[in-house]
Amino acid sequence: MKDNNSGKNSLFREENEEEVLVDPYGRKVTGLRISITDRCNLSCMYCHNEGAECCTCGPVGNEMSPELICSIIREAAKFGVRKVKFSGGEPLFRKDFEDILACLPPLKEVSATTNGILLEKRAKTLKAAGLDRINVSLDSLDPEKYRKITGAPPGTLEKVIRGINSAVEAGLTPVKLNMVLLKGINENEIDEMMDFIRPYKGKVILQLIELMNIDPELSKYTIDSKTLEKSLEERASEVRVRHLHHRKKYMIDGVEVEFVRPMDNSEFCAHCSRLRVTADGKLRPCLLVHDNLVDIGGANSPEEIEKLLRLAVSRRKPYYTPIMKIEKLKKKKE
């Protein structure tokens, strides 16, 4: 960062002749995770709804317009943001999702997370509009267990599987299957899920997700992650480590398996590079903090959007550090 711009650009640094968003702790913001709706057609037992207070099938009126979403992304892209992930709620509830994708600036990767129910008929149009790849939530291949976890009506699981097939055919690959592990419900289905994925020959990846501990009522479903990781490592022919969060990938009998720890750890916070946007137009510096949001919903110019992006980045602070985590655990015990 040049000295003569130190006042104006205190939250930016120049890298390869490009200014990038950097928070007060030196963490670059290179990605946006944008919730484009709070509406959903499932009621998953573990859902945190991207930090919103609750899951909802509420009104459309408070959702950001395609124009605002694209304006936010365009401004962020000017300052080094290269990856965008769309989520919800269920993003495919937005009938104008393809319009949003079509107006985006050039980016390294555009992805989305979906429950897959509406994916079958839209996979091709999403790909044509600019979506690069997709994550699909699939916690069980057993219809009864799937219903218990998601609250879905009969026949829903079959729709999701057809959606996965359509996504692969459309080229939204690699498709990542998000499987939240729940003790006593689906933790014994990992091998079955790997068998399901294997015929896709690398076009589908399994992401095993440790339950995020945000509700004491769900603590009984938390798995023994250390035992699981040890088992995966013993079976793997190769283990790779992703630079971000030091997340491990295991190659097991032709299937790529990635283990995703919850966000309530210091490793995640130390490497966090994302800024989140809520469905009603608020910048969320941290998923786990609710009182530092920046309202960008009323922004009507690129300059105003840039100003609000800077403000949100200035409020980014690691929620967990090793010391903070110990203190929080002590408070819980008290």
From Swiss-Prot:
Its EC number is 4.1.99.22. [4Fe-4S] cluster 1 binds at residues 40, 44, 47. It catalyses: GTP + AH2 + S-adenosyl-L-methionine = (8S)-3',8-cyclo-7,8-dihydroguanosine 5'-triphosphate + 5'-deoxyadenosine + L-methionine + A + H(+). It comes from the Archaea. The keyword 4Fe-4S applies. S-adenosyl-L-methionine binds at residues 46, 89, 137. Catalyzes the cyclization of GTP to (8S)-3',8-cyclo-7,8-dihydroguanosine 5'-triphosphate. This is Probable GTP 3',8-cyclase. The gene is moaA.
